[in-house]
């Protein structure tokens, strides 16, 4: 009798375990939305990994500009981006969430909204700050090349203080804080991390 109950319990646990594995295997995250004024453009969905960016999927947009991408559930935050040519929208993915993006091309890097994710709202704030810093640095390089190095150093220092205080130290365990640590600007065709891992 004891053996029968033990066998039944073991079989029950095995079935529950298999069901749990099967449900986990099918879990997905979704990135959906639309990009206006982008008919016939190729929209790339790219993963930002340790070895750089890799294309996960792509779609040629129709007149409506609707798109839908998905991927397997992630256990740790991962970073992706939506890209048409040089226009980029950064996306953070955590678990099985659905992120909804609405944008307008060709200014989609700055003219977009993101719903369904607190992390991505913060990533957007950081991306806009980065774009503004990049524009200011480019302007200084063009107008004051003799003083550009020292002025850009001050601008980057101010940026780091702002982002550290208002984003990284505020919620250090959030994905957007990790995203902030790897932001960069391009100076003279060379990318420079804003936060230098050897000094900051």
Q: Where do the PLM segments sit?
A:
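Solenoid-like repeat scaffolds
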Residues: 168-170
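Bacterial N-terminal signal peptides that target proteins for export
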Residues: 2-12
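A non-transmembrane, solvent-exposed segment enriched in polar/low-complexity residues
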Residues: 24-166
């Amino acid at each position: 009798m004891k053996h029968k109950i033990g066998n039944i319990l073991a079989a029950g646990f095995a079935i529950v375990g298999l069901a749990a594995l099967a449900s986990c295997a099918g879990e997905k995250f979704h990135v959906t939305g639309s990009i206006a004024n982008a008919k016939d453009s190729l929209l790339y969905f790219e993963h930002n990994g340790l070895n750089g960016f890799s294309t996960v999927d792509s779609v040629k947009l129709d007149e409506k500009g609707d798109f839908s991408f998905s991927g397997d559930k992630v256990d740790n935050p991962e970073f992706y981006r939506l890209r048409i040519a040089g226009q980029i929208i950064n996306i953070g993915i955590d678990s099985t969430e659905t992120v909804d993006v609405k944008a307008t091309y060709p200014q989609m890097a700055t003219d977009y909204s993101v719903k369904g994710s607190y992390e991505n709202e913060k990533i957007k704030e950081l991306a806009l700050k980065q774009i503004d810093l990049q524009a200011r640095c480019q302007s200084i390089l063009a107008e004051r090349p003799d003083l550009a190095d020292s002025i850009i150093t001050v601008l980057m220092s101010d940026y780091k203080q702002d982002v550290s205080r208002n984003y990284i130290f505020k919620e250090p365990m959030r994905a957007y804080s990790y995203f902030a640590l790897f932001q960069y600007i391009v100076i003279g065709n060379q990318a420079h991390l804003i936060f230098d891992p050897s000094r900051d």
